[in-house]
Amino acid sequence: MSKYNILNFKDLPVVKRGKGVESVGLIRKELGSKVFSSGITNIPSGVSIPLHSHNVVEQITILEGRGVAEVEGKVYEVETFDTTFIRGGIDHRFINTSDSVLKILWIYASTDVTRTYTETGETVPQLTESEYDNK
């Protein structure tokens, strides 16, 4: 395993998650990370991701655009460089309320991350094919 990696964003695989939402995994277990994973998600105008929680702490920083963060039923306006820190088990989602893409950087405090959909209770591994459909 290499001591370091240089990731060229244009060469990384894009995960199409439905409704035009696309994610790119950055740091992950496959690169040798043992303590965190990260990636970038683009949410198109007018689209929301499903209400969900994770099994680990998550940081999200808005890289571009503006929208709404819904956390435990409370709604917060967010814009470029605003950052959330959400503990595991907390229901949350992001809604793009702008006319342009909402680009977020996500960082998890683990390489073994799951997503549990609030509506159904279904738990799936983060960024796997079982997560692609529209919840």
Would you name each region that the model predicts?
Residues 1-35, 119-135:
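A short, N-terminal "cap"/entry segment at the start of jelly-roll beta-barrel domains
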Residues 24, 39-54:
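Conserved short histidine dyad/triad with adjacent acidic residue
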Residues 57-58, 62-67, 72:
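Glycine- and acidic-residue-biased ligand/ion/polar-headgroup-sensing regions
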